[in-house]
Amino acid sequence: MSELTHVRADGSAHMVDVTAKAETSRTAVAEGFVRTRADVVDKLFTADLPKGDALPVARVAGIMGAKKTPEIIPLCHPLPLGKITVDFERLPDGVRIEASVKTRGVTGVEMEALTAVTTAALTVYDMIKAVDKMAVIDGVRVLAKTGGKSGDWSV
């Protein structure tokens, strides 16, 4: 089993030293879902919600979330993010959200991709809760990453 890099021998947390690492191109893709009723899906994709057109707002929120990741996840390194995309796929029971993040840096962007997805999902939830208080956010996960010492992988 590998050691946790954010925990010192005495058990205290610290920010990992990445100053000696080589700068490489890195990407991460994450997904998440907002589950809701079919009639709410229709409203979501026709911009017919009481709070307005949710998907453009959620896209911008996801992008902002990725950029703010080191401010809300305590041990994340601030990174120069070169590209962030947030996309939506209509499903019969909700919406699938996918975020892709790219950088050239010394550490990966998985947390930024996850934060983009969750921030977008929270925004969708906020904008549909007036019409569906039972909506659910689920299935948030990293789908793929490239670059860095651990190499490339995908689910």
Curated annotation (Swiss-Prot):
Substrate binds at L75, C76, H77, M111, E112. Catalyzes the conversion of (8S)-3',8-cyclo-7,8-dihydroguanosine 5'-triphosphate to cyclic pyranopterin monophosphate (cPMP). Its EC number is 4.6.1.17. GO terms for molecular function: cyclic pyranopterin monophosphate synthase activity. The gene is moaC. Homohexamer; trimer of dimers. The keyword Lyase applies. Pfam families: MoaC (PF01967). This is Cyclic pyranopterin monophosphate synthase. InterPro entries: MoaC, MoaC_bact/euk, MoaC_sf, MoCo_biosynth_MoaA/MoaC, Mopterin_CF_biosynth-C_dom. The lineage of its organism: Bacteria, Bacillati, Actinomycetota, Actinomycetes, Mycobacteriales. GO terms for biological process: Mo-molybdopterin cofactor biosynthetic process.
